[in-house]
C-alpha cells in the first residue's frame, strides 16, 4: 500500500505548461482502447485541451532551448573523474536527436487540428450534452466501426505527438533527477526557503497525515502551507517532517 504522496509544483510558466502537457498526454492513453462514448469523450476532451495549451505559448521554442541547456549542463561533466562518461555522452546524443526531430516536425498539434472528426467533437464539447448521437452522428458511426479501425486511427493521432512527447519526457526526466530529496520540517504548518533558480518543487508527504501543500512563489523564493484534507476536524502538527527536492 502506498504510504507517501508526491506533489509537484512549477515555479515558472514554462514548467507549468510542460506539466500540463505531460498530464494531458498521459490521459490520452488511460482509457484505451476506445470502446464507448465515455472513453471517446475522455479522449477527445484531452485532445481538445492539449490543442488549447499548444495555442497559448511557444512550446517548441521553449523545449528546444531547454534541450540545449541540458546539453550544456551535461558537457560540464565530461572528463570529471568518477563520472560515467559513456552515459553522459549517450544522454547528450539523445538530447541532440530529440532536438533534431522536434525542430523538423510540423507545427505541434497541426495534424490533430486538421482532423475532421476531432474538429467536429471539439465544437460540441463546450455544450452541455452536446455530444449526443443526434448532435454528432459522425462520432456515433465512428464508435460502431470495427475496433481495429478505430485503434489504428487513435494510434496515428497519438503518434503525431511523438516528437513533442520524446523531447518533453527527456527534459522532465533530467529536471526531476537534478536534485535529491532532502528531509525538511515545517513549523505550525508553514515552510519557506530560497528556490535557487529551481524550475520545479517535488514534495513527498506521508499519507497518514492526510495533509496537502498549498505552494506559492517563484524560482527565487517559495512558501509552503500545509492544509488538512478534513477542513473541519483535521489538524496540522506543530512540527511536520517531509521530503523536498528543488529541481
Curated annotation (Swiss-Prot):
It holds the Pfam family ZapD. Its main location: cytoplasm. This is Cell division protein ZapD. The keyword Cell cycle applies. Belongs to the ZapD family. GO terms for cellular component: cell division site; cytoplasm. Signal peptide: none annotated. Keywords: Cell cycle, Cell division, Cytoplasm, Septation. Cell division factor that enhances FtsZ-ring assembly. Directly interacts with FtsZ and promotes bundling of FtsZ protofilaments, with a reduction in FtsZ GTPase activity. It is found in: Cytoplasm. The keyword Cytoplasm applies. InterPro entries: ZapD (IPR009777), ZapD_C (IPR027462), ZapD_sf (IPR036268). One of its GO terms (biological process) is FtsZ-dependent cytokinesis. Interacts with FtsZ. It comes from Escherichia coli O157:H7.
Amino acid at each position: 500500500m502506498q504510504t507517501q504522496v508526491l506533489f509537484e509544483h512549477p515555479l515558472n510558466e514554462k514548467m507549468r505548461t510542460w506539466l500540463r502537457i505531460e498530464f494531458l498526454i498521459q490521459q490520452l492513453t488511460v482509457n484505451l482502447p476506445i470502446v464507448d462514448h465515455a472513453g471517446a469523450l475522455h479522449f477527445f476532451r484531452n485532445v481538445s485541451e492539449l490543442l488549447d495549451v499548444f495555442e497559448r505559448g511557444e512550446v517548441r521554442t521553449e523545449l528546444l532551448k531547454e534541450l540545449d541547456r541540458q546539453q550544456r549542463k551535461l558537457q560540464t561533466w565530461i572528463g570529471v573523474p568518477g563520472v560515467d562518461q559513456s552515459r553522459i555522452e549517450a544522454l547528450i546524443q539523445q538530447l541532440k536527436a530529440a532536438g533534431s526531430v522536434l525542430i523538423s516536425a510540423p507545427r505541434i498539434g497541426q495534424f490533430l487540428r486538421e482532423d475532421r472528426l476531432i474538429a467536429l467533437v471539439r465544437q460540441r464539447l463546450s455544450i452541455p450534452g452536446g455530444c449526443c448521437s443526434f448532435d454528432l452522428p459522425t462520432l456515433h458511426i465512428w464508435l460502431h466501426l470495427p475496433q481495429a479501425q478505430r485503434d489504428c486511427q487513435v494510434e496515428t493521432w497519438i503518434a503525431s505527438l511523438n516528437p513533442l512527447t520524446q523531447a518533453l519526457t527527456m527534459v522532465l526526466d533530467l529536471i526531476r533527477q537534478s536534485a535529491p530529496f532532502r528531509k525538511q520540517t515545517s513549523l505550525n504548518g508553514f515552510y519557506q526557503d530560497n528556490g535557487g533558480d529551481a524550475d520545479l518543487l517535488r514534495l513527498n508527504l506521508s499519507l497518514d497525515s492526510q495533509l496537502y501543500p498549498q505552494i506559492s512563489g517563484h524560482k527565487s523564493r517559495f512558501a509552503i502551507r500545509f492544509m488538512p484534507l478534513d477542513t473541519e476536524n483535521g489538524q496540522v502538527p506543530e512540527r511536520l517532517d517531509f521530503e523536498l527536492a528543488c529541481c
